[in-house]
């Protein structure tokens, strides 16, 4: 009997192409987008239950996207990618509450 597949696996696999496209189009002016595409691909390709690695990748996505806040003038694809990645990152590594 195999273990159940985590709910984030299918969405991250589906976002792989969008992340690669955003990285290709925006990478020259926003280098973090090329890195983000690599992080998404790594997470999509990950196997097993390496929770520590998944947490690290989720945190890296959050860092690269400035907390999933698109830059001023970002295209719709960037907005869609960020909006889709944020809940995955929250499942893998819940954001720490901000201090007042």
Residue positions per predicted region:
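Short terminal alpha-helical segments
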Residues: 2-40
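Solvent-exposed, well-ordered amphipathic alpha-helical segments
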Residues: 4-12, 46-51, 72
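Alpha-helical protein-protein interaction elements
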Residues: 18, 22, 60-63, 74
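Charged, low-complexity interaction regions
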Residues: 24-30, 48-51, 70-75
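Short, charged, amphipathic alpha-helical segments
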Residues: 33-38, 55-59, 75-83
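Short amphipathic alpha-helical patches
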Residues: 35-49, 85-88
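Cationic, hydrophobic amphipathic alpha-helical membrane-interacting segments
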Residues: 41-69, 98
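Amphipathic alpha-helical binding modules
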Residues: 63-100
């Amino acid at each position: 009997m195999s273990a159940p597949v985590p709910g984030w696996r299918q969405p991250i696999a589906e976002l792989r192409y969008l992340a690669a496209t955003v990285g290709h189009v925006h990478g020259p002016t926003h280098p973090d987008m090329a890195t983000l595409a690599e992080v998404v691909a790594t997470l999509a390709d990950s196997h097993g239950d390496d929770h520590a690695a998944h947490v690290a990748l989720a945190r890296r996505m959050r860092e690269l996207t400035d907390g999933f806040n698109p830059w001023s003038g970002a295209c719709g694809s960037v907005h869609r990618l960020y909006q889709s990645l944020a809940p995955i990152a929250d499942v893998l590594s819940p954001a720490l509450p901000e201090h007042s």
